[in-house]
Amino acid sequence: MASKKGNRIIIKMRSTESAHTYTTTKNRKNDPNRLELRRYDPTLRRHVLYRETK
């Protein structure tokens, strides 16, 4: 039997100012649009904006 798709998917988030990426999960139902979060970038050593990529 095939199981149905869950609501949580794994996404990549890329820094807008460097090449650093984070991987995280998001709920499709609660966040149907692309995420934008301020996270710590270790290459720049400061918080920058991260955007969800495909």
Swiss-Prot record:
GO terms for cellular component: cytosolic large ribosomal subunit. One of its GO terms (biological process) is translation. GO terms for molecular function: structural constituent of ribosome. Keywords: Ribonucleoprotein, Ribosomal protein. Pfam families: Ribosomal_L33. NCBIfam families: PRK00595.1, rpmG_bact. Belongs to the bacterial ribosomal protein bL33 family. This is Large ribosomal subunit protein bL33. It comes from Roseiflexus castenholzii (strain DSM 13941 / HLO8). The gene is rpmG.
